[in-house]
């Protein structure tokens, strides 16, 4: 919905009418903007803008929210605006796909409900034509109890920023027990996850998203620029694949499909992202962004669209009297059926890259969740002497020593470090590399998930 001068006059009239409500009625409709504002998925003519209202009355329904977009710092000169209603059916979130804007321009936006006004946000539309420079901040894997979001504070203070690219793990599903992931710092930092248990239901996922968006540094980054996001696994559960997850137990946590549906509903409510169009399923969030004549950014989906279940060394490395059966394991790992993308998404990647190259853009960038490079586990026998290794083992607790010894045996075989990454799907990776070659491009591939900084040259099996 886009309104210009006459529409805005109508909104002013509606606000004047609301001013005549009895004080009790106005109080019942009082709200706060506790989760800030956000924008996302910019286009040349617009972007998504987002907020969430917190009503003082938890049973409230049909909360009216006005929105406006302007440029040059003059909030009274709105170029787009409108009114929407929100309520408990979408957890009081508001998401507006704004259109009718000019390309390559930074706009401001804000929301109003009753007498309460939200913070302002900034969003830059995608440029068209000549574009000498694009500045992107790339982030992933933000664990609320694991530490403070200082990086987002730094991002919010960047003088020039076109967009923030988020590669997934925007939230984590774990609980607040002392042994839960991240809780070695969470209690001391007063950042224990809410709810305190592992999240499974729609109410759980909504509450966890809400907690993350109370972080002031994350709010500041969202207000600074548009986010271009994909999920990874922890938005649902650790090591998600199409039909399940490592961190999902059907016997105690119910049907995985129901859990996934709850997680995705909360994600689309709480994130400034467009829902898939053109008859695609809600899992198919792959999409592209063109930054003028400079670059194309392709965001891909590698979790819920086509991913086969991950292999594990415990289940898929047969043991014989002579030791691990590496040949049998490699036959399973190299099964041509193993994939992360699926044919439809891979064809889309190829045609989108071809179109970018045909348009003369020199840069193509792939926003992808997991490490694409081949990464072998470290063979410590080649890094330290036998005596040094024995001393290391002696210093470890027995349960940790057993794990290290098992890893040492495995990695001496030259096997991959992480089977959840592209290394667990080498045939699918080769098909993607072939698509790059057919498109005639050598893209930059971004990856999250690993909680480490990597720079790799990507090479096919040839």
Predicted features and spans:
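Secretory targeting signals
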Residues: 1-3
């Amino acid at each position: 919905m886009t309104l210009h001068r006459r529409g805005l006059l109508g909104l002013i009239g509606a606000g004047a009418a609301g001013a005549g409500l009895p004080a009790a009625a106005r109080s019942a409709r009082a709200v706060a903007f506790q989760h800030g504002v956000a924008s996302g998925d910019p286009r040349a003519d617009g972007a998504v803008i987002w907020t969430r209202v917190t009503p003082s009355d938890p049973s409230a329904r049909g909360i009216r929210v006005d929105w406006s977009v302007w440029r040059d710092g003059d909030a009274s000169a709105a170029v787009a605006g409108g009114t929407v209603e929100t309520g408990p059916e979408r957890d009081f979130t508001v998401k507006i796909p704004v259109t009718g804007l000019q390309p390559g321009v930074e706009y401001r936006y804000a929301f109003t409900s009753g007498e309460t006004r939200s913070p302002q946000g900034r969003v830059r539309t995608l440029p068209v034509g000549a574009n000498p420079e694009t500045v992107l901040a790339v982030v992933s894997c933000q664990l609320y109890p694991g530490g403070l979001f200082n990086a987002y504070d730094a991002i919010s203070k960047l003088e020039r920023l076109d967009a923030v690219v988020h590669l997934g793990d925007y939230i984590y599903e774990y609980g607040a027990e002392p042994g839960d992931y991240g809780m070695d710092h969470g209690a001391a930092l007063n950042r224990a996850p809410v709810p305190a248990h592992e999240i499974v239901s729609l109410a759980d996922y909504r509450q966890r998203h809400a907690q993350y968006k109370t972080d002031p540094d994350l709010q500041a980054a969202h207000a600074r620029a548009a986010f271009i996001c994909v999920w990874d696994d922890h938005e649902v559960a650790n090591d998600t694949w199409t039909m399940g997850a490592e961190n999902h137990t059907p016997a105690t946590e119910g049907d995985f499909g129901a859990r996934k549906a709850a997680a995705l509903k909360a994600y689309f409510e709480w994130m400034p992202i467009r829902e898939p169009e053109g008859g695609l399923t809600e899992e198919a969030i792959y999409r592209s962004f063109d930054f003028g004549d400079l670059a194309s950014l392709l965001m891909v989906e590698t979790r819920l669209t086509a991913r086969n279940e991950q292999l594990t060394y415990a289940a898929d490395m047969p043991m014989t009297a002579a030791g691990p059966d590496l040949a049998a394991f490699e036959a399973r790992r190299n099964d041509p059926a193993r994939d992360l993308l699926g044919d439809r998404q891979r064809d889309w990647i190829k045609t989108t890259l071809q179109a970018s190259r045909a348009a003369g853009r020199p840069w193509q960038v792939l926003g992808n969740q997991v490490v694409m490079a081949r990464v072998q586990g470290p063979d410590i026998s080649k890094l330290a002497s036998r005596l040094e290794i024995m001393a290391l083992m002696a210093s470890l607790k027995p349960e940790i020593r057993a794990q290290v010894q098992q890893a040492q045996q495995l990695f001496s075989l030259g096997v991959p470090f992480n089977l959840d990454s592209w290394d667990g799907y080498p045939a699918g990776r080769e098909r993607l590399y072939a698509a790059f070659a057919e498109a005639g491009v050598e893209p930059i591939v971004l990856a999250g998930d690993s909680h480490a900084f990597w720079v790799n040259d990507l090479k096919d099996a040839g």
